[in-house]
């Protein structure tokens, strides 16, 4: 149903799509579509827990993820037990890095930071810097000294170096210069027009037609700042059986621009296209929907 890979949940012995909820249980030995062998890539919290248990046999490990926190108030109970020192290691996703204060935590580690550093979206550097800054602040919060270990293939990367040094001012100066050069927020606004439907070609044609109408409307207002990129597939090109494309607009999100989009949408709706595609507009987007 989706173009995103399925996530393997070992304790439930199932493959699950975290976008549409589709699941395969039990896990098939071969791909049901092509008959090939299934390959497992990357690592999740369950895989990391296994590696930790093998490396540190006596360690008491508390894992926090979607599977282990499904019950009501599970997060609070786990944090309380860890604070009482019933466990030696707290393993989880980004939730364990934010706003927590355990006075005897002296070592914090981040695995696979490169997936965030080189991830999609213009805020990837900002998000990476923010996460590392939070992580560095988790350890050694009382009298005991703390350390933070960051796993990366590019330790010399400026963002990682600045984050490790907690140099917010230098990071800000580099990031704001980069965004100005690329015309990213705050020097413009991102507006994304998304299209979805059951026929790939029809959805692409609808996105292309909307872009043509927008160009015609914008030509009547030459002083209105606007750049149109696309149509291109969304980051998840198919979601729940629907093909998805987008137009990315660099604009100034003011009354004149919103009036332009309203006119374009009205004219697009009046045209009789062979196959309709649903349209959604995000006026304050990060670049995808």
PLM regions with names:
Residues 1-204, 216, 234-237, 246-247, ...:
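Inter-lobe coupling/hinge segments of SF2-like helicase ATPases
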Residues 168-169, 204-229:
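Short amphipathic alpha-helix segments
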Residues 187-191, 226, 241-245, 275-277:
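Residues at beta-strand starts and edge strands
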Residues 206-213, 259-267:
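Short amphipathic alpha-helices in soluble, non-transmembrane regions
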Residues 262, 266-289:
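Generic C-terminus detector
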């Amino acid at each position: 149903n989706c173009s995103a890979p399925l996530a393997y949940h070992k304790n439930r012995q199932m493959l699950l799509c975290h976008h549409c909820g589709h699941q395969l249980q039990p896990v098939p030995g071969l791909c049901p579509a092509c008959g090939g062998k299934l390959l497992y890539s990357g690592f999740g919290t369950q895989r990391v827990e296994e590696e930790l248990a093998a490396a540190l046999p006596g360690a008491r490990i508390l894992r926090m993820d979607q599977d282990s926190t499904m019950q009501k108030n599970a997060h609070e109970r786990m944090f309380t037990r860890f604070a009482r020192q019933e466990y030696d290691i707290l393993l989880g996703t980004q939730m364990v890095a934010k706003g927590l204060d355990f006075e005897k935590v002296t070592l914090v580690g981040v695995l696979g930071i490169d997936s965030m550093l080189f991830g999609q979206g213009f805020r990837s550097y900002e998000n990476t810097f923010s996460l590392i800054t939070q992580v560095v602040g988790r350890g050694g919060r009382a009298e005991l000294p703390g350390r933070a270990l960051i796993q990366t293939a590019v330790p010399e990367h400026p963002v990682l170096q600045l984050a490790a040094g907690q140099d917010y001012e230098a990071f800000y100066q580099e990031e704001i210069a980069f965004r100005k050069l690329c015309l990213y927020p705050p020097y413009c606004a991102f507006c994304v027009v998304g299209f979805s439907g059951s026929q790939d070609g029809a959805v692409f044609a609808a996105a292309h037609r909307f872009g043509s109408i927008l160009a015609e409307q914008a030509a009547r207002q030459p002083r209105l700042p606007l750049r149109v990129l696309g149509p291109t597939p969304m980051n998840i090109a198919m979601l729940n059986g629907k093909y998805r494309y987008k137009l990315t607009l660099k604009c100034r999100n003011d009354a004149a621009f919103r009036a332009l989009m309203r006119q374009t949408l009205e004219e697009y709706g009046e045209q009789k296209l062979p196959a309709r595609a649903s349209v959604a507009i995000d006026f304050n987007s990060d670049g995808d929907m």
